[in-house]
Amino acid sequence: MGVAMTEGSFIPPVKQTILTVNDKDEVVIWDDAPTPKLPADQVYVRIHAVAVNPSDTKMRGDFATPFACLGTDYAGTVVAVGSEITHVKVGDRVFGAQNEMCPRTPEQGAFSQYTITRGRIWAKIPDSMTWEAAASLPAGISTTGLAMKLLGMPLPYSETKPSKKTYVLIYGGSTATATIAMQFMRLSGYTPIATCSHKNFDLAKKNGAEEVFDYRDADCAQKIRDYTRNNLAYALDCIINVESTSTCYKAIGRAGGRYVALNPFPEHAATRKMVTSDWTLGPTIFGEGSTWPAPYGCEASEEVRLFGTELWQVASRLVEEDKLYHHPLRVIDGGLEQVKQGMETVRNGELSGEKIVVRFSV
C-alpha cells in the first residue's frame, strides 16, 4: 500500500473534525476523529463542499455506528494520490460518494475535513462545474443507476434502446433523485413522466418530464393511464408511502410492468400480480454489502461493485460532456455546524424542490 505524493506536499493530520453520532445517539461535531489511511488505489481529498441527503438524517439508532463519520456526497481537491493511481494528480478536483456510518471504515465519510475516495464511485470535476454542483450529484447518480438496473433499463451510451416510445413514471418528480433519474432515463431513450405538487411542475418538466401530474389529484393514476394509453410499464417511486405505491400500481398499464422504490415499500399497497416490484439501497453501489438491520442488510456483491464502476464511468462522461445538470441548490456557507443544521431542515420536511449544499470555508 504505497502512497505517491509530490515533494513537500500534503501530510495527513493525525486527527480531524467530523460530524458523527455519539454513544447517546446524538449528532455531534467531534474534533478528535482519526483520519483515514490512503490505499494505493485511491486518492486523498480535502473537502470543499458536501450535500445533505434524506438518508443522512436516518443514521440513528440501529443504523448508527457510534463515532463513525456521517455524510455521503462530497467534492474536493486531491491532496495525495495512491501509487497505483495514474489518471489523477495532486490539485485535481473530484467528487464522489461515501458509505457513511460503515463499521468497517468508520473514519470514512463526507462530513469531514478530509476523506479518501471509495472504490470507483468518484470522478473528476470538469472545469465548467462548481464545487456545489458536483457535491450535489453522487447519491442521485448511484441511486438512479441501481434503480435502472432493477427496472431492466440500459445506462446512457448503451447501444440498446427502446424500439418504440416507452414511458416511465417518476413518482416524486421534484426530488433530487428524480432530477438525475429523468435525465439518465431520457438519455437512455425512455420518456419520463412525473408526479409532484403543482408548484413544482416547471421544475419536473425542465428536468425531462414530458408531462407532469398532481399527486394530490384523486384521478392522478387514471390520468396517467389515459396519457400513456394504458401502456405504462415502468414506475420509479421516490416518495414511498401507501399513496405513492398505490398510485404507481394503478397507473401501470393492463399488461403489467415493473415498480421500483427507493426504500422498502408498503407491500399491502402492491396489489397487482402483473406488476413485479423491488426496492433499492443506494449505499450498496460499492458492492460492499450492508450491516444495517433488516430488511436493509445484504451481502457483498462483486456484480454490483462492477456495475457501480460502469455507472460512474458513464456519469463521468456525462458531466464532462455537460449532459448532466444538478437539482436546484440551497447553498450555505460555513462548516459542519451548518451541515448539522441542514440535516435538521431535511429531517423536519422543510425542503421542497431544492437540495442543501454546504460550502466549506477552506
Curated annotation (Swiss-Prot):
Q: How is it used?
A: Compactin (also known as mevastatin or ML-236B) and the intermediary metabolites Ml-236C and ML-236A are inhibitors of HMG-CoA reductase involved in cholesterogenesis. Their hypocholesterolemic activity might be useful for lowering cholesterol levels in the blood and reduce artherosclerosis and coronary heart disease.
Q: Which EC number(s) are documented for this chain?
A: 2.3.1.-
Inducing or repressing factors? Expression is induced at the beginning of the stationary phase, which is consistent with the timing of compactin production. Expression is controlled by the ML-236B/compactin cluster transcription regulator mlcR.
User: From which domain of life does this come?
Assistant: Eukaryota
Pathway named in the protein's UniProt entry: Polyketide biosynthesis
Positions annotated to bind NADP(+) = 55-58, 174-177, 197-200, 215, 262-263, 280, 351-352
Its recorded name reads: Compactin nonaketide synthase, enoyl reductase component
Say which species the protein is native to: Penicillium citrinum
